[in-house]
């Protein structure tokens, strides 16, 4: 699990009493080695994420890759999907979903401007995650890229806290959404999903 406090609440809710092993982006090889050892002993392991589906923009994907590489077909990996902002957002956005590009979290600095230009040039739905600290900057960069590509009217949908108590969805151009968040600073909290229409 990423955070024992979060996972412990879930397990307590269903009266499940099992030992927890922390695994996150900074866990390093020690946690991976422990998981491989437990699997080698025939133990069953559950990969639990704090939010969303394990392995989707989540450090769990590296663990699954390592298990597959080291143990191959000797271990059975099953998916029990949880809520995912990616699929939940696409299902209510009203955009083409037969073909889309998912970028996960955008880089903080290096390559970000180039990526925004690539997003503007894509002719399919584009989806990415953004943090509350960078959502306004992302919308400004997206507006610049779409304007440079002569597509400033392209529809953008920003979804916040999907499947949670303070869920909200706003749509418009990138420029309109920038104004929206400036006018509603209390909405610049939580986890964001950004969907750019083709």
Predicted regions and their residues:
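Short hydrophobic/aromatic-enriched beta-strand-loop microsegments
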Residues: 17-25, 77-78, 97-104, 149-159
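General beta-strand structural signal in soluble alpha/beta enzymes
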Residues: 2, 77-82, 128, 158
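A contiguous loop/helix-start segment that scaffolds small-molecule binding in enzyme catalytic cores
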Residues: 40-44, 125, 129-198
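Short, acidic/turn-prone active-site loops that include or flank metal/cofactor-
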Residues: 4-5, 22-29, 83, 103-108, ...
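Class I SAM-dependent methyltransferase SAM-binding "motif I" and its flanking Rossmann-like core
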Residues: 62-122
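RNA substrate-binding interface of SAM-dependent RNA methyltransferases
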Residues: 1-19, 79, 87-95, 101, ...
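Short, well-ordered secondary-structure micro-motifs
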Residues: 33, 58, 89-91, 113-114, ...
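Class I S-adenosyl-L-methionine
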Residues: 1-78
């Amino acid at each position: 699990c990423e955070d024992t406090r979060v996972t412990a609440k879930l397990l307590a809710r269903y009266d499940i009493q099992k030992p927890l092993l922390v695994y996150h982006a900074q866990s390093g090889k020690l946690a991976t080695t422990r998981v491989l050892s437990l699997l080698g002993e025939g133990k069953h392991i559950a990969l639990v994420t704090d939010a969303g589906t394990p392995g989707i923009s989540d450090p769990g994907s590296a663990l699954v890759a390592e298990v597959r590489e080291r143990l191959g077909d000797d271990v059975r990996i099953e998916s029990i999907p949880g809520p995912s902002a990616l699929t939940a957002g696409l299902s209510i956005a009203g955009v083409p979903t037969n073909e889309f590009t998912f970028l996960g979290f955008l880089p903080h600095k290096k390559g970000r401007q180039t990526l925004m230009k690539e997003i503007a040039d894509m002719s399919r739905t584009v989806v990415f995650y953004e943090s509350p600290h960078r959502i306004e900057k992302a919308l400004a960069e997206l507006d610049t890229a779409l304007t440079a590509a002569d597509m400033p009217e392209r529809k953008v949908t920003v979804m916040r806290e999907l499947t949670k108590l303070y869920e909200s969805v706003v749509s418009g151009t990138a420029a309109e959404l920038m104004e929206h968040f400036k006018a509603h600073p209390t909405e610049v909290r939580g986890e964001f999903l950004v969907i750019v229409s083709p």
